[in-house]
């Protein structure tokens, strides 16, 4: 975690890392002095992957129908794991403020490890905050849901990414690739 690096952990890992020919980092700020070559590979999306390729309008509608999302009304979407750092409860609170002015729907879609007790607690908190609003769709998706995520983003009027600590997530790049406004 770059926001709070642990020097003792780095020193422990360094001896293992230097046993390789090269170390790959996603940003220059993450690299550290090493005796081996370092390479920068910035995070990116795959435009031809299932998560980002063009989809037919019929396919997008099919996914929305499966989840009972009405494409005729504005859709606000956040794609992320169910994690407190993604602030899904804060997203619901923001949606409720918007809902006072615009008849819209909210989709919170993502996954997480089923063996992560905190992730399941977050999901429970989100479901509790969303209950009694039929226009909030909390979708806990399996790992192989790239087409569904793609369709949900393409059906969206606006995509949110309310991460509390992440500077710029790939879901932002994916939504922008699909020409969706991102907040």
Listing of model-derived features with the role each one plays in the protein:
Residues 169-172:
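Short glycine/serine-rich donor-binding loops of glycosyltransferases
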Residues 3-64:
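A short, active-site helix/loop in glycosyltransferases that binds the activated sugar's phosphate group
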Residues 53-75, 99-102:
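Nucleotide-sugar donor-binding and catalytic loop/hinge architecture
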Residues 110-151:
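Nucleotide-activated donor-binding/catalytic signature segment of Leloir-type glycosyltransferases, i.e.
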Residues 65-86, 92, 106-107:
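Conserved donor-binding/catalytic core segment of Leloir-type glycosyltransferases
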Residues 181-183:
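Short hydrophobic beta-strand element within catalytic cores of glycosyltransferases
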Residues 164:
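Aromatic "clamp/platform" in nucleotide-sugar-dependent glycosyltransferases that forms part
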Residues 157, 179:
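A short alpha->beta transition loop at the rim of the catalytic pocket in nucleotide-sugar-dependent
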């Amino acid at each position: 975690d770059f926001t709070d690096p642990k020097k003792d952990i780095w020193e422990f890992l360094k001896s293992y890392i230097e046993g390789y020919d090269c170390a790959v980092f996603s940003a220059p700020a993450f690299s550290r002095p090493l005796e081996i070559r370092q390479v920068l590979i910035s995070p990116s999306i795959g435009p031809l992957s299932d998560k980002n390729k063009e989809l037919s309008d019929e396919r997008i509608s099919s996914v929305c129908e499966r989840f009972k999302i009405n494409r005729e009304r504005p859709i606000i979407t956040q794609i992320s794991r169910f994690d407190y750092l993604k602030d899904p409860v804060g997203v619901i609170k923001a949606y409720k403020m918007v809902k006072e002015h615009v008849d819209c729907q909210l989709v919170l879609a993502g996954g997480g490890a089923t063996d992560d007790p905190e992730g399941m607690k977050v999901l429970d908190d989100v479901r509790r905050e969303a209950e009694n609003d039929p226009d909030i769709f909390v979708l806990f998706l399996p790992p192989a849901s790239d087409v569904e995520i793609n369709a949900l983003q393409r059906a969206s009027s606006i995509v949110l990414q309310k991460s509390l600590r992440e500077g710029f997530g790939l879901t932002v790049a994916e939504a922008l690739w699909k020409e969706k406004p991102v907040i």
